[in-house]
A protein has these predicted regions:
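Conserved catalytic core of the tyrosine transesterase superfamily
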Residues: 1-260
């Protein structure tokens, strides 16, 4: 609350530490505090470069932000959301297929909306499809039998109705027969989960996290999960083992006679 003007040359580590303590007292998130440090350090570097004012913050490291564990839904909840979608009309069948596919493949929302019909060329014979990830990197992923069946039904019963005689390569279409947008996929997830009585804030990434967590819980090798998720580095995938480790720890303390 005591505001005091500080000249750029006076910005030192003691002042920055006091500022961080003040932010923590105000319950500012660690990620925001880390960003503030980076901004101030860059400002000090700019003053040094442009005005010849030596930076006293060169070696000041931003606080380490604890890794947020991804939110995964229980299998029963995923099943409840997917199974609650009626497939009696073209939109319902499309929505159900989108949910099936997000959970079956762990696709990112950007990969899902960019899917083209030709990316399914091996669906019948090999039960796989092509996804194009970050940097347009192609990967082939297996499609589970329920998602596969839903896709086949969608291609026969729903997509032609949505296309309304137009020509189009996009796999998933909106009600005007155009490529579906990310916003509509978000909306589908929000509305369909609310209808199933799941009132948590869900996103397409929730399905991706659930996909990875359930695979690792089921004993899948981390390298396989890395490949399926399209992670360039296995360390990105290792966060899912932390989720599982939490469950292991919980079970241990609940079950071991001398640990309770």
């Amino acid at each position: 609350s005591n505001k005091e003007e500080i000249a750029p040359g006076g910005l030192n580590t003691n002042i920055l530490n006091s500022y961080l303590a003040h932010l923590r007292k105000e319950n500012i998130a660690e990620a925001s505090i880390a960003r503030a440090v980076v901004v101030l350090r860059n400002f000090a570097r700019f003053c040094e470069k442009e005005g010849g004012i030596p930076s006293l913050l060169k070696d000041f490291e931003p606080p380490r932000v604890p890794k947020r564990l991804p939110k995964a839904l229980p299998i029963e909840t995923i099943n409840r959301i997917i199974d609650s979608v009626s497939i009696d009309d073209a939109i319902g069948l499309r929505d159900r297929t989108i949910l099936e596919l997000l959970y079956s493949t762990g696709a990112r929302i950007s990969e899902l909306v960019e899917l083209k019909v030709r990316d399914l060329s091996n669906l019948i014979e090999q039960q796989t499809l092509k996804l194009f990830g970050k940097g347009n990197k192609e990967r082939v992923v297996p499609v589970g039998s329920m998602a596969s069946k839903s896709l086949e039904d969608y291609l026969v019963r729903s997509r032609p109705m949505l296309l309304k005689g137009k020509r189009g390569e996009a796999l998933f279409l909106n009600s005007r027969g155009e490529k579906i947008s990310r916003q509509i996929v978000w909306q589908i997830i929000q509305e369909r989960s609310a209808k199933a009585g799941v009132n948590e804030h869900l996103s397409p990434h929730t399905f991706r996290h659930s996909f990875a967590t359930h695979l690792i819980d089921g004993g899948a090798d981390i390298r396989v999960v890395q490949e399926l998720l399209g992670h360039a580095n296995v360390t990105t995938t290792q966060i899912y083992t932390l989720v599982t480790l939490d469950k292991v720890r919980e079970s241990y303390f609940a079950a071991h006679p001398r640990a309770k």
